[in-house]
From Swiss-Prot:
Chain intervals with Polar residues compositional bias: 1-11
Single GO MF annotation: sterol binding
Originating species: Dictyostelium discoideum (Social amoeba)
Identification of the protein by name: Oxysterol-binding protein 9
UniProt keyword Transmembrane present: no
Gene name linked to the record: osbI
Signal peptide: none
Length: 428
């Protein structure tokens, strides 16, 4: 494995910020081979130049986190963690134990101290940070298998960038966010539903080589000391030759909400399908995970950020609801391994590693964006400026207005339903 990690004196695994910033290294748990070859395009991402926010975003992630000795991002900002936990305990006292017994958090009014100064719509674009590298390469190849490899690498490459400790603001119905990517692609996000919260997006390559569309139906619930987040919904990358690769996202676990190490992990499976070329790709996150009881008596064999996967012919392999229970070994075309915090290998060739610097997105001039843009929200603007009390005030005003609009909408629906029933009765 190439040198992508260094060990701290406490035994934790620390991520370097550049290819040369690590003086000591360890080999990944997935392989002991020190002669791993990388695909050529990776060399484009070992230095940063351009207008994108990728380096700033990644530097923030590296400042806040280090890789836990058992895998996963461990949050290391003790001051921020102490502040957040104080707010969380206050929340439990004010709303009762329902908050730690599985109550849906997306419909819960949370204190502003738990938020970062941006909307979830902007956070969605963090997953697109490596788009100019991988999606361009995917669009330019004529090999369907290589294209599937690039799309899978694109998704894996962005996972470590999504694990910020602070919560983004819930978007308002009709809220938008727009930005550009380094290759000239443009992204547009919109909140299309409030209950349930649904965020949609469209990423368009400037010459029509690819189009990435989809939406997240997002939910989160707390169980004791753990929050589980789910991002359901379709993701489709359509290429100029008519190929469409559809895929799903894994769930996320945030452990240590109230006590212990604050660690973020991904769990479950991702399934990519290319029906035109009879191809599929399955990625399993934390494949050797132990159950709750077993974890008390046994030590897990591999880090929890481990990924195991394969690309295979769909043929007669049954795919249902985003899952493929059993894959015929004869249909497997290549194997994948690695972790979402070190490197990602496909048939022992490196397709991504943590030393790579993402392009990120380029923000547009606020004067050119729509009036509904996230950046125009008063609560977000004041939080960015550090005006906590003003941010609280505007957040409360926005939430009161949302409740009022919902009440008016519900009353109108009831009234319309009543009129329909009366019309039917009169017709008889």
């Amino acid at each position: 494995m190439t040198e992508v990690q260094s060990i701290t004196t406490s035994g934790e695994i620390k991520m370097p910020l550049s290819p040369s910033s690590s003086s000591s290294s360890i080999s990944s748990s997935t392989t002991n081979n020190t002669n791993i070859k990388s695909i050529p395009i990776l060399s484009q991402c070992y230095s940063f130049s351009g207008k994108g926010n990728g380096k700033e975003l990644q530097d923030k992630i590296f400042r806040q986190n280090s890789r836990h000795s058992n895998g996963g991002w461990k949050f290391v900002d003790d001051i921020e963690l102490k502040k957040q936990r104080g707010v969380c305990w206050s929340l439990v006292k004010s709303v009762g134990n329902s908050i730690i017994e599985g109550k849906e958090l997306t419909s819960t009014c949370l204190p502003i101290e738990l938020f970062e100064a941006r909307s979830f719509l902007e956070k969605v674009t963090d997953t697109m940070a490596f788009g100019p590298l991988y999606l361009k390469a995917a669009a330019e190849t004529n090999d369907p298998i290589e294209r599937m490899k690039m799309v899978a690498s694109f998704v894996v490459s962005g996972l470590h960038l999504t694990t910020t400790i602070a919560k983004p603001f819930n978007p308002l119905l009709g809220e938008t966010f727009e930005c550009d990517l380094a290759d000239g692609s443009s992204a547009f996000c919109e909140q299309i539903s409030h209950h349930p919260p649904i965020s949609s997006w469209k990423l368009l390559e400037k010459d029509g080589k690819y189009k990435y569309t989809g939406h997240f139906i997002w939910s989160a619930g707390c169980r004791g000391n753990v929050v589980k987040g789910c991002l359901k919904g379709p993701h489709n990358i359509e290429f100029a030759d008519g190929t469409n690769i559809a895929f799903t996202y894994p769930d996320v676990l945030i452990k240590g909400i109230f006590w212990g190490d604050r660690v973020t992990e991904f769990c479950g499976k991702m399934l990519f399908t290319d029906e035109k070329n009879d191809l599929a790709c399955e990625l399993i996150f934390n494949p050797n995970a132990l159950g709750f009881v077993k974890s008390f008596f046994s030590k897990q064999k591999t880090p929890c950020d481990t990924i195991d996967g394969r690309i295979f012919r769909i043929n007669n392999n049954k795919i249902k609801d985003g899952n493929c229970d059993k894959i015929n070994p004869d249909d497997v075309l290549c194997k994948m391994e690695g972790t979402w915090l070190t490197s990602f290998l496909i048939d022992q060739v490196e397709y991504w590693n943590i030393r790579m610097i993402p392009h990120g997105v380029i923000y547009r001039d606020p004067e050119t964006t729509l009036p509904t843009d996230s950046g125009r929200r008063d609560d977000i603007k004041h939080l960015k400026m550090g005006n906590l009390e003003e941010a609280k005030k505007y957040k409360a005003l926005i939430e009161d207005n949302q409740r009022k609009q919902k009440k008016e909408k519900d009353e109108k629906l009831k009234k319309d339903e009543k009129l329909k029933k009366e019309d039917k009765k009169n017709q008889k």
